[in-house]
Design a protein with these regions (language model features):
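Active-site cleft segment of glycoside hydrolase catalytic domains centered on the general acid/base Glu
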Residues: 1-57, 79-90
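Structural recognition of the beta-strand scaffold that forms the well-ordered cores
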Residues: 1-3, 39-42, 68-72, 96-101, ...
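Solvent-exposed loop/turn segments at secondary-structure junctions
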Residues: 4-10, 45-49, 74-78, 102-107, ...
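Glycoside hydrolase catalytic-domain groove-lining segments
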Residues: 29, 33, 37-41, 62-110
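Short, acidic/polar
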Residues: 48-62, 120-131
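Aromatic/acidic polysaccharide-binding cleft in carbohydrate-active enzymes
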Residues: 96-175, 180, 185-195
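Carbohydrate-binding surface patches
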Residues: 189-231
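Acidic, Ser/Thr/Pro-rich beta/coil linker or hinge segments at domain junctions
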Residues: 227-255
Length: 255
């Protein structure tokens, strides 16, 4: 896949929406003439709110055969309606949606202590859960799995002391990434506004995952609509005290 990173913003190539469409068409045709399989990435936007940047290419049918995926970066977050637009765009072109840079605050490295705070971890996993539920991306590429924007702390990372150790963000990512392979998104709703949910399932293998993010006080949760043949569920809890702490829940009559 080929793209100029965040060309809606100009880092470091600046396109207008129409120029972006023309580039996809002309460079895509050039690659095709060279018999290269490389496809073009539509968007790769600096955040989700600049959705209109991809509209000229969406409306120009001659660009579609060169587009391999649609992408936006999740910086700064956005509302549910905007996320839904990206999901619908991917469905319209029948290509995957990729979150090309995943996290919430591109400037956070300037005040890096925030990476070790639970509030930052909660905001980030909330956004990822909403993205998974609403626009169903093929992949969220975490920015980034290095010492920069690190999911780890200690050993001098941003001058932090002590041994290298995982932060709450690490366990959030690990828990989300534990979704079964080749699982498809399943519709899920929550009766409480302060709980975000996303569900996945691989029906052929009988593997399912339900991710819940609680933004309120401790509470009991009842999940309904599970397959009738499931008798137990493995539960993982991550918060300021628990790091994917595992337990087993009994399932009866699909709940």
């Amino acid at each position: 896949m080929f793209s100029f990173n965040e060309s809606d913003l100009g880092i470091d190539v600046l396109h207008t929406p129409q120029q972006h469409a023309e580039f996809i068409k002309e460079f895509g045709e050039y690659l095709a003439k060279l018999n290269l399989p490389t496809k073009m990435l539509l968007g790769d936007n600096s955040d989700a709110t600049t959705f209109d940047f991809i509209l000229p290419a969406m409306k120009d049918n001659s660009t579609h055969k060169y587009i391999g995926a649609i992408s936006f970066h999740s910086w700064r977050g956005c509302d549910d309606a905007t996320l839904a637009k990206w999901g619908e765009a991917a469905k319209q072109l029948n290509v995957p949606l990729i979150i090309g840079e995943g996290s919430t605050d591109a400037a956070a490295h300037r005040y890096a202590e925030i990476f070790n705070e639970s509030t930052f971890a909660l905001y980030e996993i909330n956004l990822y859960t909403r993205i998974c539920a609403i626009c169903q991306p093929l992949s969220i590429l975490q920015w980034q799995l290095t010492s920069d924007y690190s999911l780890l702390w200690g050993d001098g990372i941003y001058r932090s002391q002590g041994p290298l150790r995982p932060t709450q963000r690490f366990w959030n990512m690990k828990q989300l990434a534990s979704t079964p392979e080749e699982a498809l998104s399943i519709p899920v709703t929550s009766s409480k506004k302060n709980i975000n949910a996303a569900a996945f399932g691989n029906i052929a293998r009988g593997e399912y995952a339900i991710h819940l993010v609680n933004n309120g006080a401790d509470c009991n949760a009842t999940i309904t609509g599970l397959p009738k043949d499931i008798q137990t569920a493995t539960v993982f809890i991550t918060n300021t005290k628990d790091s994917m702490t595992q337990s087993t829940a009994t399932v009866k009559d699909g709940k």
